[in-house]
Every structure is written in C-alpha cells, then in structure tokens.
Amino acid sequence: MSKFLKKIKIIKPDDWHVHLRDNEILKKVSQYTGTFYKRAIIMPNLEEPITNCFRSISYRRRILNSMTPNTAFQPLMICYLTEKTSPEELQQGFFKKIFVGAKLYPHCSTTNSKYGIKNINNIYHLFNIMEKIKMPLLIHGEENNLNIDIYDREAKFIENTLKPLRKKFPELKIILEHITTEEAISYIEECNSSYLAGTITPHHLMLNRNNMFIDGIQPHLYCLPLLKRKKHQIALRNVISSGSKNFFLGSDTAPHFHKNKINTFGCAGIFNAPSSLLCYVSVFEEMNALQHFQSFCSENGPNFYNMPINKETITLVKKPHKILEKINIGKNIIVPFLAGKRLDWSIEK
C-alpha cells in the first residue's frame, strides 16, 4: 500500500487495553474510546478493583451510561486477580460472559495494584481452571523487585515468571500487555504460538526514554512500563511493520488529572484516547507498512480472543488534526498525549 495514500478505510478497530477510570473522569474520557473503537478491554484496576461479578456488572453499566446515546460501543470486562479470588466466581463470570478474561497485576507494580499478586504460585490453581475453560490471562509483565533495575523488569518477568508459567500451563491463552522491549518481542516471536500474544501502545511506538527528559522532565510522558531505549522503540516499530499476527493494538490509555501528574509523587499513565488511532496510522505510514495497519488494529486482536471481526468501518484521511491542549473536567484538567501538536491524519466525519 502506497505511503502517499490520502485516505484509508479499515474495519472499525478495537482497543484491547483501556483505562476508563470512574465517576467524572469516566463520563468524559469514555467518549473518545467509544468514538474510535467498537470494543475495548476495560482494565479492572479501579480504587475498588473489579474482583467479582457484581462489581463488573455495575461498572459495565456505568460505562454504558456514560456514553452518548446511540453509541454502539461494547465494553469487555476483566476480572482483577487477587490471592483471594474465588475459583467459582472466576469460572461463573466467564461462563456467563461477565468476564472475557482475567488480569494479573504483580503486587504494587502499577496504578491501584496493591491488591495484586505477591506470590504467583498462590494462584496456580486459578490458572489451571482458566486453561481448562479457555479463559484468557492478561498480564502486566514486570518483575516488581527493588533489586531489579526498573528498565529491566519486563525482561526479568519473562525469564523468571512467564516462561515457567507457560511451561506449566502451555495451553493457557496469555496476552503480554503493553510490551516495550526487544526481549518481549523475541520471546513472543520465538514461541509463535496461538496461546501467546502481545499488545503495543502508540506512545512506545512514537517515543523512547530520551523524550521524557527533553527541555526538563516531562511528567505527562511518565507511564508504566516506562519508555525504553531507542533500540527497543525501533524493534517495536519493526515488528508491527512485519505483519506478524502475534501483536495487536492496545493503547493503554490511562487518564490522570494534571495536578496528579505534576505533583511530588506523580501518577504513571498517558491519556492517548483522543489521538491513539491517528498515532498508529502515522507510525505505519512512516514505516511504509500501511498494508498491515488493518490487521494490527482490527483483525489480530479478535482472532486471538476468538471473537468476530467487526462489520463497521472507519475512514482516516490525510488531513492535519490538532490535538486538544487540555480537557476540562469540572475544576480539573487532563492533558492528553501530544497536547497541542498536529498529526497528519484525521478521522473522516
């Protein structure tokens, strides 16, 4: 497909990794995801995490109520795994289609992960059930150990946790989310398995860790996993350009109020929902790989999750689009990814 293309029409994509938060933030940010994406995997790490069916049903209702009328958006709900998760609740939630998967957060590895797993061996009985019922496991793949350099935590997690896990449960469907390193890419490619995939964010494709320190510290580029060396950014860009079916779109859009991003203990997360699809198409164009854009955005994810591919389409046009400087929510603001900057692509109205 020509890199000089002025318009591209694709099957409407899904976002396989979204943080919508709750309350006033939810009411504002859900519109962006609901506009660009047909379905989205909703992360369960609220302050009161989505650990059971009741909370999931209630949260899903709040999401749908936050949408503008006639928005044909489908939130896909995930169970937050703890060491107290009930096997019966997990299985019932999956069979009743309340949950489409379960999320493993290593303890205190990211936002609202204090209820996460301290010892993965303590939930092997849950993985045994999930493997049998074909319930996907979504993983924040970082080893949370102060003795491990924070830039090495993904690679160490793969070596110390993921490899033994997959050896024990070879037919457990696993999504290694928001991958950031050559090591993650190599492992997924070497396995080349229908039971293992990775999602990739727009910010890890567009930026590397140098960008966090240009003209001073850039708190709005602080995310977990962190931006990595340029060689890892290049590896991510190369793998999506290869057309590999083992990787798909997961924006990890993660809103926080501006005041919580710039304070002494700033929150990790990049709110990219207003621009994520435009960022992805820009990278595919730069890599002269637009022929693989639809597969990455709209086909690889549903195929991995054994879900139907969407019937609707969306059209992107080569027309400059300026990202909002800020988004007002009551007396607070959220600063989106690439705030105030122009992208070469827009969504056709």
UniProtKB/Swiss-Prot annotation:
The active site is at D252. This is Dihydroorotase. Its EC number is 3.5.2.3. Belongs to the metallo-dependent hydrolases superfamily. DHOase family. Class II DHOase subfamily. GO terms for molecular function: dihydroorotase activity; zinc ion binding. Keywords: Hydrolase, Metal-binding, Pyrimidine biosynthesis, Zinc. The keyword Metal-binding applies. The modification N6-carboxylysine is found at K103. Zn(2+) 2 binds at K103, H140, H178. Catalyzes the reversible cyclization of carbamoyl aspartate to dihydroorotate. GO terms for biological process: 'de novo' pyrimidine nucleobase biosynthetic process; 'de novo' UMP biosynthetic process. It comes from Buchnera aphidicola subsp. Schizaphis graminum (strain Sg).
